[in-house]
Amino acid sequence: MHKIEQKWQKIWKEEKAFQVSNDSSKPKYYVLEMLPYPSGKIHIGHIRNYSIGDVIARFMTMQGFNVLHPMGWDAFGLPAENAAIQNNSRPQDWTYSNIEYMKKQLQSMGFSYDWTREINSCDPQYYKHEQKFFLELYDRDLVYQKESLVNWDPVDNTVLANEQVVNGRGWRSGAIIEKRYLNQWFLKITNYAEELLNEIQNLKDWPEAVRVMQEEWIGKSTGVNFHFKIKYHENSTIEVFSTKPETIFGASFIGIAFNHPIIEQLIFKTDEIANFITKCSYITKSSELEKSEKEGVFTGLYVIHPFDANIILPVIITNFVLMDYGTGAIFGCPAHDKRDHELAMKMNLPIKKVIGTDNTQEEVLINSDWLNGLTSSEAKQKVISKFETLGIGKRSVNYRLKDWGISRQRFWGCPIPIIYCETCGIVPVPYKDLPVTLPDDVSFDNNYNPLEHHPSWKHVNCPKCDNHAIRETDTFDTFFESSWYFTRYCNNNAVEMTDSKACNYWLPVDKYIGGIEHAVMHLLYARFFTKLMNEHHYVSIREPFKGLFTQGMVLHATYKDENNNWLYPAEVVKNGNEFFHKETNTRVVQGRIEKMSKSKKNIIDLETIQEQYSADAIRLFVLSDSPPEKDLQWSASGIEGCSRFIHKLDNMFEVISSLKDDMNNEINTELNRLIHFTIKHVADDIKTFSLNRAIARMRTLTNAIYCEISKDKIDVRTIKYGFNVLIQLLNPFIPHITEEIWQKLGNKERLYKSVFAEFDDSMLEFSTYIMAVQVNGKLRDTYEFNTDISEDEVKQITVNLPKIQKFLAGKEPNKIILVPRKIVNIII
């Protein structure tokens, strides 16, 4: 099988089988899998993702589309830098070596990529365009720098996004995260929050789960900003944001974030306050707030109620108010908010109910002075109007989404093209001096960014005044590169950032395939970038991905030895119901079935399994055992079964090719109907990504043809036609063996160039159908009925079946439930 696979991979390469032109006379289809990080080896999770995309690409080609199916590398990132530190090498050497190795792995799997369009994000010829684009955005004031409180990883010595902090620790290093103020560069994604939110509903071919996640991440809240005067400091106020201002008479405290400016201005920091602030600083995202026990500490300050000067409210630093949402301050209404209630109970604060029901059971305001009797919506508008009349508040909209911090304090990334001059201030690098490339002579003898300490690269002359200046030593967040790469595939040799003519033809991406873990960062940033690129006339679209498919993960059992060390599956052998170490024969504990990961070693080596079976067998298994959107559990017996199926096809060819047409002595109409039925439904299944169901249908057709061969009287012509069709249907899934059999069947045209089989509508109606026969809901038999039979006849036949009579034992059934053409359930 390996020789066959190598043969066809060589032919495809020589014939430039998957090299596609920008031919606008043809209907286009752009299918794209998320580009991988070149970590060293392709894993089975990657293979599932790419196999799904390859089925779609090959199928759409056979449907007559001009298909763009490219591949590239998301090549910047921290792992390369860490590898350089560990191995005393250069990140670029490690990265390019991995790319070369992983590319060979992908080619060995027979994926139909147009490798002439390959991109590499660490190539200066790629990232020079994003440096120029950054400067264009800077000129439009869509880029700015400010001092910001950041999550600092003291081990990796870099800033982490909130999403990269898990339970207060760095997602890679595991170090406890510190809070620091650093100058950071930001992109104004919040300028586009409303459009990003509104257009989600137009993404009809995206999973609902992803759309909801993006909506929640953007997090639009409509309410009011208003001010509370601080008692004894009545020239000072605390501004709060509220989505429920109608509950203002139920307020019992003001909650502020641990880093609210008022703390530095007016509050005397006791040890209790200082310790609480330190504790709060470890909470980095709102998802952690929900899990945290609600706590607070009194500041010593009070504010005056805006509508009743006799009501004085304490100001409390809380662990559930964030400075980067709203104003960093809220008024707490414990009777009508779960978090406020939890804190009020703990701190013995008043709990005043201000919403009740009237005699019609409609919610109305109570205990609220001039708001009493109004509905919540009426009261809300009246309160906001009152704030505006008094000049202490105004209507406002807040978003959970914050501007995108793009600065990273690492070497292996795209340099930010900015120069700092004592005379001229911030100076953009002139376009003619792009790209700003990374130096080759760097030292990784400590964990600090080597750009910061480089003796020559950092020091330059100012482009404006020619005096001494220094470069920006931060690099771009690596999401910067992956936010526009899909546009570069349209023409990766374009002089500018994009080839607008090619982009107009290919974009948007028709189907984008990748993991749901990218729902709110990569996918949101890519949508944002597309809008920016549209405004700069690089692309004509404002949404990058017409369709999105999120595949499930590949799972495997985990194993540990007696010393609690993780073991690879290849190191473990099963004996009965127990597991043992292959070399030491010591007992091994099987743990949970989890996502394959290097850290827990529950990974399958691609080359080992490929050598044992074949690329086609791997492709078939990762597509057949579970719906593509669901998780897949790796199974040795499963891939073994797929390998047997492929060998069965080869054996069937040997038998079928020996059959002579003059041996035809039986017309099998039902087999012919099944062939046309399979053509139609396999095509439909591929279009809806029901790939496991498509494979099941093709297995059914395979078995039907195999059974026909075994009969004394056979329909040779239908068998040969059906086998030809079967090989064609299977080609997008297992391309190597099907190309081989197709050629041996005498077909002159390459299979990858052929037109997908067409079905005859008139052949789709079957003269019989099979029904399941149940007794008390349990399957006891099946029976094949003619399509023209009545329901009464169906019931009569089923109760008289020998297997059913055994359960009836001479009695009459109490009831017969019939689901037409599917199930008969006999109740006794």
Swiss-Prot record:
Positions occupied by motif 'KMSKS' region: 595-599
Keywords for this protein: Aminoacyl-tRNA synthetase, ATP-binding, Cytoplasm, Ligase, Nucleotide-binding, Protein biosynthesis
Superkingdom to which the source organism belongs: Bacteria
Motif position, 'HIGH' region: 36-46
UniProt key word Magnesium: no
A GO term from the CC aspect: cytoplasm
Residues that coordinate or bind ATP: K598
EC annotation from Swiss-Prot or TrEMBL: 6.1.1.4
Reaction(s) the record says it catalyses: tRNA(Leu) + L-leucine + ATP = L-leucyl-tRNA(Leu) + AMP + diphosphate
CDD domains noted in UniProt: Anticodon_Ia_Leu_BEm, LeuRS_core
GO biological process: leucyl-tRNA aminoacylation
Compartment list: Cytoplasm
NCBIfam families (UniProt xref): leuS_bact
Family: Belongs to the class-I aminoacyl-tRNA synthetase family.
UniProt protein name: Leucine--tRNA ligase
Biological source species: Rickettsia typhi (strain ATCC VR-144 / Wilmington)
Primary gene name: leuS
